[in-house]
């Protein structure tokens, strides 16, 4: 539901349904719903209901797929949206609902802190992420910001490109289902990423390359494109991968041919 903000572009039901089917076809064990702010989508609850019903009838050899929702918590200011969230929290296929708000990065940080306990009390599946920046990565949009906290976090990041695991594991697996299980074992639950247009990315940003579209391309073609993909080298973290002397990363470069 990328760019799902008051002034942004919303994912259509056709794209959402196709994205869900792509995830099921790929053997995904976790479906992460994010944005923009997903609760700003005019059909937020309807889409989540659709997802919950669809996943209720899916079984894989590695377990039943669940879904999570990532939000900034702005819905807590609105009674109608809060009631919608309360209903969504009751869905049996929901693994967790995370509200993220970091000091210096989110305008609503003070508001979330004020009502933090009330928000958490809505459900045992409600989580608040507000302890620093776990991993701020330059995915294109972040590199254009003037926010000093974000710029500092990016410059000090010693991690590698966000697409690395996907690009690497896909070259060592035969099927998309095998890949999905491998990524789940590596705690990579948010890739590949489908944006609001239906484009599929190996990272979490629409600024990153697309390897197909869930509406216009058949899923096998998308998988083959993902399998051929290598880091494009556009974001600043590519330097960490390119220059690292770590044996595992040297091997990773050899496998990917970079």
Model-predicted segments: where are they?
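A C-terminal junction/extension of Radical SAM enzymes
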Residues: 117-210, 251-258
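Active-site beta-loop-alpha junctions enriched in small/polar residues
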Residues: 36-38, 72-76, 102-104, 131-139
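Short, aromatic/basic amphipathic alpha-helical patches
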Residues: 53, 81-90, 110-123, 146-149
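Catalytic-core regions of glycoside hydrolase
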Residues: 85, 89, 97-101, 113, ...
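Conserved SAM/AdoMet-binding glycine-rich loop
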Residues: 2-5, 17, 21-98
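Short cysteine/histidine-rich metal-coordination sites, predominantly Zn2+-binding motifs
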Residues: 10-20, 248-257
């Amino acid at each position: 539901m990328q760019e799902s903000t008051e002034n942004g572009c919303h994912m259509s039901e056709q794209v959402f349904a196709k994205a869900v089917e792509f995830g099921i076809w790929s053997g995904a064990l976790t479906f992460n719903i994010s944005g923009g702010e997903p609760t700003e989508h005019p059909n937020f609850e309807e889409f989540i209901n659709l997802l919950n019903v669809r996943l209720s009838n899916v079984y894989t050899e590695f377990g039943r797929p669940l879904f999570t929702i990532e939000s900034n918590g702005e819905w807590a200011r609105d009674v109608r949206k809060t009631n919608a969230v309360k209903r969504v929290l009751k869905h049996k296929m929901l693994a967790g609902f995370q509200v993220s708000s970091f000091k210096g990065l989110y305008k609503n940080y003070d508001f979330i802190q004020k009502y933090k306990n009330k928000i958490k009390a809505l459900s045992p599946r409600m989580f608040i992420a507000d302890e620093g920046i776990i991993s701020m990565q330059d995915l294109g949009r972040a590199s254009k910001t003037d926010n000093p906290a974000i710029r500092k976090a990016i410059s000090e990041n010693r991690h590698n490109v966000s697409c690395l695991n996907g690009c690497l594991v896909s070259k060592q697996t035969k099927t998309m289902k095998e890949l999905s299980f491998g990524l789940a074992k590596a705690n990579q639950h948010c890739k590949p990423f489908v944006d609001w247009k239906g484009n599929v990315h190996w990272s979490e940003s629409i600024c990153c390359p697309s390897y197909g579209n869930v509406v216009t391309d058949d899923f096998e073609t998308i998988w083959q494109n993902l399998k051929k993909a290598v880091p494009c080298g556009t974001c600043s973290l590519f330097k960490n991968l390119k220059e690292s002397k770590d044996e595992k990363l040297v091997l990773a470069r050899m496998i990917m041919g970079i």
